[in-house]
Design a protein with these regions (language model features):
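Pre-Walker A adenine-sensing motif
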Residues: 1-15
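Conserved lysine of the Walker
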Residues: 31
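Hydrophobic positions on the alpha1 helix immediately C-terminal to the Walker A/P-loop
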Residues: 34, 38
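Short glycine-rich substrate-engagement loop in P-loop NTPases that contacts/grips substrate
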Residues: 53-85
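Structural recognition of the conserved hydrophobic beta-strand(s) that form the central parallel beta-sheet
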Residues: 114-120, 153
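Interdomain motor-coupling "hinge/lid" segment immediately C-terminal to the ATP-binding subdomain
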Residues: 126-262
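Accessory nucleic acid-recognition modules appended to NTPase machines
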Residues: 211-386
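Domain-level recognition of nuclease-like catalytic cores that cleave nucleotide substrates
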Residues: 426-459
């Protein structure tokens, strides 16, 4: 099994709280396996209830009034002994059983066992999960399990996790991180090797099944088979959406690669229907975001804190949730050309997609780009977490030092920008406010701590 960074956070959670933990995220990001690894590390007994594979298991919670009733019914769905203090019980795919979410508080209060939940955002069932359950079970006293359950979101493997999975030595990762932290060049030999690993990441991506297929076989065709299966799974979920909107969703999903390959990479609404207005299919884009299928990056007119006040929701780029799926959708032998590092390929869309994916995985939440007729366009602007805005430009060619728009906003005194990052194929260097980093270092860009720690008021 693939090791994931989230394992440390999960261990810390179960060591320090009695609450249940729900992992959410897109299909096939590894939520269930994260709990299976946890069970092997910390528990003697593990029980897994999957509400998709075993629909009858929903009866465990339907109409239940207390933990005793729930546990009695649960015992009918497992042949394993439940050992108090030593058992982890996973409720998998809880979007199919919203009552589980609202009633988990009874089980946590009872305290005999520990609980995990997973929910796939691919499907409308999970949206407003607590609200739906409350409507159904008002007489049973259903309510949101505040104080009884925490929620963490999983993403595909980031580049650091991928590098470890394919055998990059930990000391090399440490060297690269040290170079990032101290803004110094990576050893040239290491840099060349990491660029090869990065090009492999572009075609394999970070979804566990394709990554595991590569680790086990080193066969890109096997990787592609896994990617096709995941795309088909996504399309199956889309087909179960509102009948009036599923065709539009399907078309949006299929248009992502070509729209990203366009000159400005912005999603052009007329490609869907010249007669449609944004408001009419805004929910379709929101569904794809909440489902984890796509990453929207909204336009801001000024790079100022808070960015959300300057955003234009009807102007956006739409990236794939995983760069490997994007590369697969381009097809036409592009995998081999990427691996060989052909200089005539337009890597722009793929590079920007991988950066969007990395920023999401590192906790930046909503992403933005800057565009104005007067100053030009900058690929990403993010809130660094320390009260500043950080512009990020992504360059895939030899002209990485040409970035007029970035220079324009750095020179605009009213924006008060003291640093910008240019992600490119080259090694680390600094020119005044501009920091040039190898593209693979996007995995180390973290959001700084926003909330202060201990603060004692002196009166």
């Amino acid at each position: 099994m693939l090791a994931r960074k989230i394992d440390v956070a999960i261990d810390t959670f179960y060591d320090n709280t009695k609450m249940a933990l729900m992992l959410t995220g897109a299909r096939q990001v590894g939520k269930t396996n994260a709990f299976r690894r946890l069970a092997r590390r910390k528990f003697e007994c593990y029980v897994e209830i999957n509400f998709i594979e075993t629909p009858a298991a929903k009866q465990i919670f339907l109409g239940s009034q207390n933990a005793k009733e729930i546990l009695l019914r649960l015992s009918a769905f497992t042949d394993r002994p439940l050992l108090p203090g030593k058992t982890l019980i996973l409720f998998d795919e809880v979007q199919k059983c919203p009552e589980c979410v609202t009633q988990i508080k009874f089980l946590v209060d009872e305290g005999s066992y520990r609980y995990g939940l997973t929910g796939s955002l691919l499907g409308v069932e999970l949206e407003d999960l607590q609200e739906k359950a409350q409507v159904k079970d008002q007489d049973a006293g259903a309510s949101e399990p505040v104080g009884y359950m925490d929620i963490k979101t999983m993403y595909p493997l980031d580049f650091e996790e991928f590098a470890m999975a394919v055998g990059v030595a930990p000391n090399l990762i440490d060297h690269i991180r040290d170079c990032f932290d101290n803004t110094k060049p990576v050893d040239p030999v290491v840099h060349e090797q990491m660029m090869k690993v990065f090009r492999l990441y572009l075609i394999v991506g970070g979804l566990p099944a394709p990554v595991w297929a590569y680790v086990q076989t080193n066969n890109i065709q096997n990787v592609a088979l896994q990617q096709l299966a995941i795309i088909n799974l996504y399309k199956k979920d889309i087909s179960q959406y509102d009948k009036d909107k599923k065709l539009l969703l399907d078309e949006i999903f299929d248009l992502i690669p070509s729209e990203l390959n366009a000159k400005n990479k912005r999603f052009i609404l007329k490609e869907l229907d010249r007669n449609l207005k944004f408001q009419r299919f805004q929910n379709s884009f929101l569904w794809m975001k909440k489902a984890g299928v796509a990453i929207p990056v909204y336009n801001v007119e000024e790079p100022r804190i808070p960015l959300t006040l300057n955003e234009h929701r009807n102007l956006f780029k739409l990236f794939q949730n995983d760069v490997g799926l994007l590369a697969y959708q381009y097809a036409n032998g592009i995998q081999l050309r990427i691996l060989s590092g052909e200089v005539d390929i337009n890597f722009g869309a793929i590079y920007e997609n991988v950066v969007a994916q990395e920023l999401m995985a590192q906790g930046f939440g909503q992403l933005y780009y800057f565009n104005s007729k007067k100053r030009g366009e900058v690929d990403f602007v993010i809130e660094a977490g320390d009260g500043t805005v950080l512009p990020i430009e992504v360059k895939s060619g030899k002209d990485y030092e040409r970035h007029n728009a970035l220079a324009n906003i750095l020179d605009t005194e009213e924006y008060n920008l003291n640093k910008a990052i240019i992600l490119c194929d080259e090694n680390v260097s600094v020119q005044e406010k501009k920091v040039y980093l190898p593209i693979y270092m996007a995995t180390f860009i973290r959001k700084k701590q926003e909330i202060p720690g201990i603060y004692k008021l002196e009166l």
